[in-house]
Amino acid sequence: MKNLNVNKNSVISRLINNYLLSHKFTIFFALIMMIISAGATGLHAWLVQPALDEVLIKGNKEMLLLIPIAIIIVTLCKGLATYAHSFQMSKVAHSVIAKLQTQMFEKLMYLNLNYFNDSKSGNLISRLINDTYYLRLAIVKSVTAVIKDILVIVFLLGNMFYQSWSLTLFAFFAFPLAIWPIKKIGKSIRKITYEIQNEIAKFSNVLAESIKGIRQVKAYNREEYEKKRAFATINFIKKFFIRSAFVSNRLSPLMEFIGSLAVAVSIYAGGVFVLNESMSTGQFMSFLVSLLLAYQPVKALGNLNISVQEGLAGAERIFSLLDTSLEKLEKHENSKNIKLKGNIKFSDVNFSYTGQKVLNNINLSIECGKKAAFVGLSGSGKSTLINLLLRFYDNYSGEISIDQKDIKSLSLFDLRENISLITQETLLFNESILDNIRYGNMSCSDKKIEEIAEISGVSKFANELPGKLNTIVGESGIKLSGGQRQRIAIARALIKNAPILIMDEATSSLDNLIEKEIQLALDELMKDKTTIIIAHRLSTIQNADVIFTLEKGSIESKGTHEFLLKNSAVYKKLQLQEDANAH
């Protein structure tokens, strides 16, 4: 609820200045169409008077022909104008929402990892989809209602005053009574909608987790648990929607009552005027038709506040994302197309996360083209070193340099363009094998990808698939085995051909047999590259040029496999654990 203190006027002003004004010509054209549509409604009401007075009472045969023709022409003009302004305003709304969604997605792509660590994916997805949905409705309804419905009321009021100004004052005496409850209901709806959107975000998160982790759910027989978790959120959403309906639906009977008062007073007073011959029957009926036609736009303006408040609640959540602190944004300077060799050095590097020391006075160097491995117990800081080298986090002390260049002096694009990363969990997109490999180098030709697929061993299994390299892998590569996904990851890194290669427990999820099968592909990948390996199994790093052992965020020892077996307590412990697990 903390974001509800955002100033409503500032949100509206921002929407108008930053998003709606760029469509001012389209909105102006729609406004002209609204004037025509509203004027046609007023003309419909006015035509009742000559239809009664001139045709039915006076028997004017010329008017008998003209009035039906006039009604057809007015109706046609109204229909065309209504279509035009409705289409144009929908186009504006969709354009505004597309711009907001583009800005939000761009913002998400450039936020640092800290932001994602503190956020739930369902909440972020909800802002992009649900909040923009509410705002889209608000833009279409509010602009159309505020302009068109007010214009309709103005034209109808004009006809009512034309027929009888005194009767008009009688008819509208009760409408000011509706202002306070409309305002009160609107505020309540805004608060409830904000809660609904938060709960929908939670539900999106539960849904995403349950579907993504469906194998774990089934393996642990947790279907009932996930049902309870989802049902609890669904019930919260249901309660908020019921509250919203309870509050918003109060407005309808209120407007019905006020409308009936206006009609009752008008019929009584108008009847008196007609009986006193101060008003003709045609004038009274024209007045009454105008009053009845005015009821719907007046009611729509009352309900409009509900749509506006729902849209504002969505806009607040959208802008809270767009206004994320600059401290949480990665700084993407322009690329200078720097090509690095791969001499890496950490000098007095310290790093804390959420107040806890993670790395303590790290000093190390890795020569260009050498293979370095990092081992240690879980939580010793191995992956954190990689995160700092890739500048996923910048709030460390000390210096990290590549080729004697402080990595903070490099643009993020240049730095990361010189590094290939293979992780334990291979991210594959729901596209073809070919496109998933191309992700490493978007300008690469199909022929080059086919060559890389052969080298990495991807072709070995792809050729057995119906679509070969054009086979769709499924969401997160679900249609492939772990070894097959890892081969694609290797191919992706090969095609990027960066001078620095990082393998963060890249083969830890594979069994020994599969690991040996892809070792040739890995050897090809590591050739002539500075390679950093975060190791799970010591057997995979015995040929490393240097191995660093980490303990509680500090380097305990470094050396070759043989040296560490004799001199490192941490390394000995890890070797004993591996030997025990092998038996």
Where are these regions (language model features)?
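ABC-type nucleotide-binding domain
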Residues: 337-583
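Alpha-helical segments in transporter systems
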Residues: 17, 25-46, 67, 71, ...
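Helix-loop-helix
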Residues: 57-67, 159-176, 243, 247-316, ...
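Transmembrane helices of ABC transporter permease
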Residues: 22, 26-37, 69-77, 141-195, ...
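An intracellular "coupling" helix at the cytosolic face of ABC transporter transmembrane type-1 domains
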Residues: 24, 113-114, 130-139, 143, ...
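Short intracellular "coupling" helices and adjacent cytoplasmic loop segments at the cytosolic face
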Residues: 2-6, 94, 102-126, 130-134, ...
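Juxtamembrane loop-to-helix connectors within ABC transporter transmembrane domains
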Residues: 11-12, 20, 85, 89-90, ...
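Membrane-integrated ABC transporters
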Residues: 1-41, 56-67, 85-89, 93, ...
